[in-house]
Amino acid sequence: MLVPAPFLLVLLLLLGAPQVGLSQRSPKAGSSPSCLHTALREAEKSQRKDTSLLIKRTFPALPRGDPEDQEGQEEEDTEKRTFPGSVGGGGGGGAGSTRYKYPSQAQFQGRPSQDKAKSDRRTKVTLSLDVPTNIMNILFNIAKAKNLRAKAAANAHLMAQIGRKK
């Protein structure tokens, strides 16, 4: 769990600050809060900088500006995630493209012509959670291939030993 830096500084102030009593007077009592205030401002600046970098790198869909701009950004994000589909209905051609089903040409023949918005929806494929699954399948296939190569090498070694004994 990550705790914000200003919270940690305030906690440090409350728990670790020296107690000023009757017998204990600090000659620089006025400078200590100003130092802490400066440190707190620096921590807030660095935190804003870090969070803005995180937002830019890992969370492009988070709202950053005015509510009016969010609608345009959502449309741009949707356009970035969609790809024109192939004419044959296969989609992106990847391993998960069989999950996207399009109506056959026979179904289109009986219907009247549809407006452009509906036909555009059928020709675009939207990325979903299939992408990480496809990547995992590729990694599993690579691991299986390495395992098979290792077994084949071990079998070849055994066959060579058997051939020497005869």
From Swiss-Prot:
It is found in: Secreted. Keywords: Amidation, Hormone, Secreted, Signal. GO terms for molecular function: corticotropin-releasing hormone receptor 2 binding; corticotropin-releasing hormone receptor binding; hormone activity. It comes from the Eukaryota. Residues 24-123 form a propeptide. One of its GO terms (cellular component) is extracellular space. Residues 41-123 are annotated as: Disordered. InterPro entries: CRF, Urocortin_II/III. The keyword Flavoprotein does not apply. One of its GO terms (biological process) is cellular response to nutrient levels. Residues 41-51, 113-123 have a biased composition (Basic and acidic residues). Residues 86-96 have a biased composition (Gly residues). Coiled coil: none annotated. Residues 68-77 have a biased composition (Acidic residues). Residues 1-23 form the signal peptide. Suppresses food intake, delays gastric emptying and decreases heat-induced edema. Might represent an endogenous ligand for maintaining homeostasis after stress. Binds with high affinity to CRF receptors 2-alpha and 2-beta. This is Urocortin-3. It comes from Bos taurus. The lineage of its organism: Eukaryota, Metazoa, Chordata, Craniata, Vertebrata.
